[in-house]
Amino acid sequence: MIKTLTSLLKQDKEKFTVPKGVQDVIPVKTIYDDGIFRVGKDKYSKTFKFTDINYAVASREDKEAMFLEYSELLNSLDSGATTKLTINNRRLNRLDFEKSFLISETGDYLDKYRREYNKMLLDKATGANSIVQDKYVTISINKKNVEDARTYFARVGADLIAHFSRLGSKCVELETDERLRIIHDFFRVGEEASFHFDIKETRKKGHDFKDYICPDTMEFEKDYFKMGDRFGRVLFLREYASYIKDSMVAELTDMNRNLMMSIDIVPVPTDEAVREAESRLLGVETNITNWQRKQNQNNNFSATVPYDMEQQKKEMKEFLDDLTTRDQRMMFSVLTMVHTADSKEQLDSDTEALLTTARKHLCQFAVLKYQQMDGLNTVMPFGTRKIDAFRTLTTESLAVFIPFRVQDIYHENGIYYGQNVISKNMIIADRKQLLNGNEFILGVSGGGKSFAAKNEIINLALASDADIIIIDPEREYSPLVKAMGGEIINISATSPNHINAMDMNREYGDGANPVILKSEFIMSLCEQLIGGNNLGAKQKSIIDRCTASVYRTYQQNDYQGTVPTLQDFRDELLKQDEPEAKEIALAIELFTHGSLNTFAKQTNVDTNSFLVCYDILDLGKQLMPIGMLVVLDSILNRITQNRAKGRHTFIFIDEIYLLFQHEYSANFLFTLWKRVRKYGAYASGITQNVDDLLQSHTARTMLANSEFIIMLNQAATDRVELAKLLNISDLQMSYITNVEAGHGLIKVGSSLVPFANRFPKNTQLYKLMTTKPGEGV
């Protein structure tokens, strides 16, 4: 037998003691503050958690790259340690879900909508997979003391994290309470919310940590076990097929049940593996030689070597070739699985379903007889292995059991965006948790862009204390804003609503003198009013001087009282001696005292409502460039005010491509896009004209830097551009090609997942969100 395996079995051999209590079933002897468990006489273990990656929806080339990178990870495993890969399916706790995601009623007029939204969320949670899949790596090693183990885990952990990072997966080490929570949640289904463990408090009171995690009762039968009122069964993979598809692990763990699957891996040092393979090959060749000698003695000189002997020789040569020339390692592995159910009938039915799935892949699972306790301690991420049903594999054949499938997006206190098409889990995302929470919603007309934006607006209006600002060029949001109690500001040359272009608060300057920043804005405004020609140095100096002058009294009064207007600014220009000042005053007269003076009057609308919609449908061609600048500046005013109050602001800009048609509004928007994050604000751009949008270098940069993108059904040319810009595979592209409304891809940080968002039509909220004729309010 191979020396590595012999010494491992010797180390793992322990004297069997009959458990005197439920606590004795758990094989952990000692726990330490840094997440290390002692699980044997000199055996220590440490668990790491890693995130899923988009393997199932990757292109063939990407899959190959991921497979090879995962093989590299397996090759890097230390031959002196045992590595356990665990996939843990745990059911989403309804109480936790309600606490985290349902919207609390506040007793106001919006409660009817909150009840409707909560009912939708609960229906989706019930219909969804409602299974959260966690993935772990547990390393166990024999060391003389915990200090040696600590040093070892620090080194191995750094390598492990680096390898997972190259795969695009985030790997973190688990603390003691996090490891205990895994065990607690498995043994005490339905009591997840009650788990609380403080290691210092436990020691102080002299309590046993096992009391916090073990079930009330445990009974082990011949081929199943019972913990409390639940039933469980441990299986192991007995027979492997010659060829296994890389989707087998994903299919086995796709069951909507609490289950755990573990693969224990024992790598063999290459020199030892090569010696063993050469010895086996020599044995096969000796058998062939002996057979031929016997045939020759019988004068049977033309006899061909039996097929099975030839096959053995061929396979051993291939195996040796893998080890010596193809960078493969020899690995011993054991695959075990535990699943639980509420009744024995359900357990038997689930077992049969798992056996059928394995048979489909020409593999054979078997139930452990009289070894259920040993099997349970093998499959769970303690770091122990009590089942020795080893199978010899190469790195490549072991990598087929790839633990990756698809990323799920599940942020605490996030917003519901739909269901993951592959895992069927709910997509709950919080843009505030991203490095750059700005968003784009892209799709053809009728693809569900406005619906997606309104869904987000409704959630923010009902569940948060954030302010919401909408720029609406198509008058699509008015019914929703009215229903939510917001303010609609109609902006046009003939509208009675006015916004003062020179509105400014003390926070406008980002800590510096706000007039300096406002002066820049007035210069941009004047360039637009004069006709888009660049201002000369003289003109800029005059504008800067006049801006400082008109704001002087307002600043001296501590930003209280009447704010100056563009009319005051023009009057100040006329007081200057330079002829250039008179020219500027004449050029802007149409917009200060003429028929387009809507932005030269005092603001007479409530721009401080929690929900403000700027309706710019009637803004004519002449007023559009200046109108967009003034609206964006008004939004900047609001954002800076909210920052001082510690309040978040969400800005939704429909048909954002309109803003990129004007140089100044495009540049202003680009600056806003970069700066809003530090102000606690988040911008969203909505458009169907992706091709037009990407013609602008500014827009292209903004899109590439946005970490949150919702892509719905796309036109052919737009798909090609998006695929290039965001590195989308052909398979992923199929989710934004000729799909129904509300279906597509959602990019959250580095995750890109296919989603579907179907909202119940028999609700008031649906009527407020839909733009289909005859369905709206």
Give the positions of each predicted feature.
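Conserved P-loop NTPase
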Residues: 726-777
